[in-house]
């Protein structure tokens, strides 16, 4: 990882959860059983999918001078758990 922290920033996390919750609210199928997420609420399901790295999403981080780096959500969640341990939620 060359750009940014080895975990999702609060802005990246909020954006992904918001977009996914919107998708779920207009009828997209959840990638997990809602019972595993503990709720049928689209926001709770979206949080569960993001926090467990289930979504097939890539984050693209830009450099000020141009260029950037693409990182998968599952890899960022994995790195965050290695670094932050139980503090990562």
From Swiss-Prot:
Cellular component, GO annotation: cytoplasm; DNA-directed RNA polymerase complex
InterPro entries reported for this sequence: DNA-dir_RNA_polK_14-18kDa_CS (IPR020708), Pol_omega/Rpo6/RPB6 (IPR006110), RPB6/omega-like_sf (IPR036161), Rpo6/Rpb6 (IPR006111)
Protein name: DNA-directed RNA polymerase subunit Rpo6
Organism: Aeropyrum pernix (strain ATCC 700893 / DSM 11879 / JCM 9820 / NBRC 100138 / K1)
Source organism phylogeny: Archaea, Thermoproteota, Thermoprotei, Desulfurococcales, Desulfurococcaceae
Single GO MF annotation: DNA binding
GO term, biological process aspect, one: transcription by RNA polymerase II
EC top class, as a word: transferase
Hydrolase found in the keyword field: no
The EC number(s) this enzyme carries: 2.7.7.6
Ranges that cross the membrane: none
Subunit structure: Part of the RNA polymerase complex.
Subcellular location: Cytoplasm
Keyword terms: Cytoplasm, DNA-directed RNA polymerase, Nucleotidyltransferase, Transcription, Transferase
Chief location category: cytoplasm
Family according to the record: Belongs to the archaeal Rpo6/eukaryotic RPB6 RNA polymerase subunit family.
Function: DNA-dependent RNA polymerase (RNAP) catalyzes the transcription of DNA into RNA using the four ribonucleoside triphosphates as substrates.
The reaction(s) this protein catalyses: RNA(n) + a ribonucleoside 5'-triphosphate = RNA(n+1) + diphosphate
